UniProtKB/Swiss-Prot annotation:
Gene label: Klf13
Post-translational modification: Phosphorylated by PRP4K; phosphorylation regulates its transcriptional modulator activity.
Region called Disordered, residue ranges: 23-54, 70-168, 250-289
Organ and tissue specificity: Ubiquitous.
Protein name: Krueppel-like factor 13
Organism, scientific name: Mus musculus
Record GO cellular component, one term: nucleus
Record's keyword annotation contains Metal-binding: yes
């Protein structure tokens, strides 16, 4: 900084000296009166002064031009100054927002309900909720009036998605079982309440059961009845699940063999050997074979 200030000061001195000496080169209007004693030396002195002044002014003029050219070239800014300048220009630059979308054209006016051949209603805008979207369906023939049906596209309840055959739900917390018959639901609810309404009527047997099929299986232990026979070896069993387990051990066994047999050798219903919550119709011990 000190060197630059010195150079500027020196250039200013040169320019001042050039401006002060410029009067010497201007022609004078008339000769000035000179003293009589200096008449002999007068012709030689002005020539020497003019030569010296010309050399000095020429050298000062060259130096001034060089310094002026140097001052016009600004020094390169430091990296930190460049970053600061870029940040300042970025801060001064106004933020440009994207252009706003054009407004939708106005739709046609809705026609009265009695007007025949009325144009369809314009589609709902993009920002409307899809749950409340209206779907058009053709009205009755000859009416000329479109029927509107409102249907939710997203939020559908679980009951709508379930099969209509399974509509009896368990109301206990944490239990999500659903049944197709109310009797099956009642039998399942006994697993929560602990109720056992089906008691064994055999002498000195006080066992009770929550389902009638369980009572029927138990009653066969008293009578010794074995109504389930194997279609291959004719071996008999009290329970159908015991028969199925035995029949699968045969090499030539096929599941259709148990389904074709009837009468006293039938396999029975699925509830006789399964642990499902479905309840079969009530069978009293007296009516069971």
């Amino acid at each position: 900084m000190a060197a630059a200030a010195y150079v500027d000061h020196f250039a200013a001195e040169c320019l001042v000296s050039m401006s002060s000496r410029a009067v010497v080169h201007e022609p004078r209007e008339g000769p000035e009166p000179r003293p009589e004693g200096a008449a002999a030396a007068a012709p030689t002195l002005p020539r020497v002064d003019e030569r010296r002044d010309g050399k000095d002014s020429a050298s000062l003029f060259v130096v001034a031009r060089i310094l002026a050219d140097l001052n016009q070239q600004a020094p390169a800014p430091a990296p930190a100054e460049r970053r600061e300048g870029a940040a300042a220009r970025k801060a001064r630059t106004p933020c440009r927002l994207p252009p706003a979308p054009p407004a939708p054209p106005p739709g046609p006016e809705p026609a009265s309900p009695g007007q025949a051949g009325a144009p369809a209603a314009p589609p709902s805008p993009a920002w409307s909720e899809p749950e409340a979207a209206l779907e058009q369906e053709p009205g009755p023939a000859g009416s000329g009036e479109p029927g509107l049906r409102q249907r939710g596209r997203r939020g559908r309840s679980r009951a709508d998605l379930e099969s209509p055959q399974r509509k009896h739900k368990c109301h206990y917390a944490g239990c999500e079982k659903v049944y197709g018959k109310s009797s099956h639901l009642k039998a399942h609810l006994r697993t929560h309440t602990g109720e056992r309404p089906f008691a064994c009527s055999w002498q000195e047997c006080n066992k009770k059961f929550a389902r009638s099929d369980e009572l029927a299986r138990h009653y066969r232990t008293h009578t010794g009845e074995k109504k389930f026979s194997c279609p291959i070896c004719e071996k008999r069993f009290m329970r159908s699940d015991h028969l199925t387990k035995h029949a699968r051990r045969h090499a030539n066994f096929h599941p259709g063999m148990l389904q074709r047999r009837g009468g006293g050798s039938r396999t029975g219903s699925l509830s006789d050997y399964s642990r499902s919550d479905a309840s079969s119709p009530t069978i009293s011990p007296a009516s069971s074979p």
